[in-house]
């Protein structure tokens, strides 16, 4: 990834917006394409004078999204900090429903041994968690319903916080269960459903679970800033694959045959380098469409994605959620840290969504 000179004071902070003749126009990064199809989201409309406020754009995106998930690429990525900012800062409108895939909210990270921020909720928040977690929080609880969803820590129940306080979460682990819990939240009066995603669960990008994804990354992922940025952008690209137009049923009858016959193929399982590279070498994959169920089914390297793009192969998905924002933490749990300004600037250069430093901008 190329280094770019930092903008002069007073210039736009976000690469997605440039001024031209007093108006704002969109600047599209080469990273915004896969197979020649632009899949970035429109950042903002021109609203007159003044400097573009990334926080305003972030709040707009969050408040227009009913179901969202927060996915961490590594430990200490700032996921809980972002979650607490959403839950308690008055930034999201209406009643919130909260659950987690896996356990979260404990005070110490069992992997790194570092102290973690607890999950703090406001009075009125709806929470779905396992029964064994109820004794660990300090909120006053009103049990609203049982779900019949089993976990190693007991059945998942839905409660309403009758006071502000800390909670610990252990929610469902299956997509259909998460969808069911979100639906229950809305039936009980929630305006928004938030899923605290487990580490590396890219499947939370599926439309069946969430409309939008908050991607959290940081220095704990790797000592190399270059690698952290490159891998984060790779995940961002996959999460933002364009939604596919409907394909005929016969488009699922074999990758090579369907591409030759229809110029498009529906890949029913995982899409891997082993499947794709031979077809690239043979010239079969050129100016065609490959459709997968959701981004979690794409197991391609960044290099292979670039090769598909060069051959004008459009990679699309039946179910997808857009990336709402990316949060970065320049401080690692393992003792190293990045230059915060360089890390933030380079990440903003590489993507077309708001990028927030959780250490400073969510205080």
Model-derived regions: residue spans:
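Solvent-exposed alpha-helices and their adjacent loops that cap or buttress functional pockets
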Residues: 60-64, 75, 91, 119, ...
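A generic structural motif
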Residues: 98-101, 289-296, 354-363
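Conserved catalytic-core segment of NTP-binding enzymes
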Residues: 174, 178-350
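Walker A (P-loop) phosphate-binding motif
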Residues: 55-92, 96-101
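Short, basic, glycine/proline-bearing loop/turn elements
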Residues: 67-73, 160-171
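N-terminal phosphate/diphosphate-binding loop that engages ATP/GTP or pyrophosphate donors
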Residues: 86-159
């Amino acid at each position: 990834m190329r280094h770019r000179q930092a903008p002069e004071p007073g210039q736009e902070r976000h690469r997605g917006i440039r001024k031209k003749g007093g108006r704002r126009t969109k600047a599209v990064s080469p990273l915004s394409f896969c197979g020649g199809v632009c899949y970035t989201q429109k950042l903002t409309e021109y609203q007159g004078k003044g400097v573009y406020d990334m926080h305003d754009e972030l709040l707009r995106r969050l408040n227009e999204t009913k179901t969202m998930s927060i996915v961490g690429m590594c430990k200490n990525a700032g996921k809980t900090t972002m979650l607490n900012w959403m839950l308690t800062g008055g930034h999201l409108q209406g009643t919130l429903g909260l659950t987690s895939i896996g356990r979260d909210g404990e005070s110490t990270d069992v992997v790194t041994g570092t102290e973690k921020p607890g999950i703090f909720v406001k009075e009125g928040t709806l929470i779905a968690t396992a029964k064994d977690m109820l004794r660990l929080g300090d909120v006053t609880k009103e049990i609203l319903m049982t779900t019949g969803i089993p976990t190693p820590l007991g059945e998942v129940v839905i409660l309403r916080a009758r006071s502000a306080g800390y909670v610990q979460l252990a929610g469902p682990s299956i997509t259909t269960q998460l969808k069911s819990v979100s639906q229950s939240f809305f039936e009980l009066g929630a305006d928004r459903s938030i899923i605290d995603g487990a580490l590396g669960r890219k499947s939370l990008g599926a439309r069946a679970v969430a409309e939008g994804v908050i991607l959290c990354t940081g220095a704990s992922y790797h000592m190399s800033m270059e690698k952290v940025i490159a891998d984060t952008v790779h995940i961002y690209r996959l999460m933002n694959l364009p939604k596919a137009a409907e394909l005929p049923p016969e488009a699922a009858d074999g990758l090579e045959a369907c591409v030759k016959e229809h110029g498009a193929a529906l890949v029913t399982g995982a899409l891997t380098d082993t499947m794709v590279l031979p077809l690239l070498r043979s010239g079969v994959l050129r100016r065609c469409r490959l459709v997968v169920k959701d981004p979690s089914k794409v197991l391609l390297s960044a290099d292979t994605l670039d090769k598909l793009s060069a051959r004008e192969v459009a990679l699309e998905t039946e179910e997808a959620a857009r990336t709402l924002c990316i949060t970065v933490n320049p401080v690692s749990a393992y003792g190293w840290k990045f230059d915060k300004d360089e890390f933030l600037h380079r990440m903003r250069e590489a993507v077309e969504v708001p990028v927030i430093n959780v250490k400073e901008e969510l205080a």
